[in-house]
Regions:
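S-adenosyl-L-methionine
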Residues: 1-221
Length: 221
């Protein structure tokens, strides 16, 4: 069912939000999604109590995902990266000028560019998952009363194809539309760190070295 139960401390952290950001605990590809608070995440999802485009965008960037892979360890036969809140999220040096303890994201550049790129990525992924003409959107009266958003029901002629439209499959395929939006987001996040020289060709090692330097400088401050 769509009900499920959230741990009380997680439920408390979502007070006043309509959505939260989440990522699978163990996944071959590290991606983040936003889910309505009525949807109780499976226990295998890591919940981050933010709904804004800015935090969703920073976490979805190559920069954060590299940090998470480097710090989170790996698990299982597939040796898949694990996301651990205390190792991957709480240690992450967010861009200067951004304070996670502030409930409202800062306005103006460079943050507006991240939020816009993140919203565009989110929109594009949604359209890929539920293409127009493939699905009808429906809610039962009970779901409506509980505040659930409508959910997609595939049209019979598209049902088999729609079933294959999962985020894991999307990130396996990495179509040009996804790549373009991901690179735009990565660039916007890199600029927030002051890395004007960022390109997709920048090595993972360079990015991690810079993040570690940022982290050390902040710890020393």
């Amino acid at each position: 069912g769509r009900q499920g139960r959230l741990r009380p401390e997680v439920r408390a952290s979502l007070q006043g939000l309509s959505h939260f950001t989440a990522t699978p605990e163990t996944a071959k590809h590290r991606f983040f999604v936003r889910l309505p608070v009525q949807v109780a995440p499976e226990h295998k999802l890591i919940v981050i109590p933010r709904q804004d485009d800015l935090v969703f965008g920073i976490l979805s960037s190559r920069i954060h995902c590299l940090w998470a892979i480097e710090n989170g360890g790996r698990l299982g036969v597939g040796n898949d990266p694990v996301y651990n809140t205390s190792l991957c999220f709480e240690t992450f040096p967010f861009p200067p000028g951004f304070d996670l303890r502030e409930p409202q994201p800062p306005n103006g550049e460079p943050f507006a560019a991240i939020a816009a790129a993140a919203a565009d990525l989110d929109r594009w992924r949604e359209q890929w998952l539920n293409p127009e003409g493939w699905v009808e959107w429906a809610t039962t009266p009970e779901e409506q009363a509980a505040g659930f958003p409508p959910r997609p029901i595939p049209r019979p002629e598209h049902a088999a194809d729609w079933k294959r439209r999962t985020l894991t499959n999307l990130y396996n395929e990495k179509p040009a539309g996804l790549q373009l939006r991901q690179e735009r987001l990565d660039r916007a996040v890199a600029l927030a760190y002051g890395w004007d020289d960022y390109t997709p060709a920048m090595t993972d090692a360079t990015i991690l070295t810079r993040l570690l330097r940022d982290n050390r400088q902040r710890s020393a401050a």
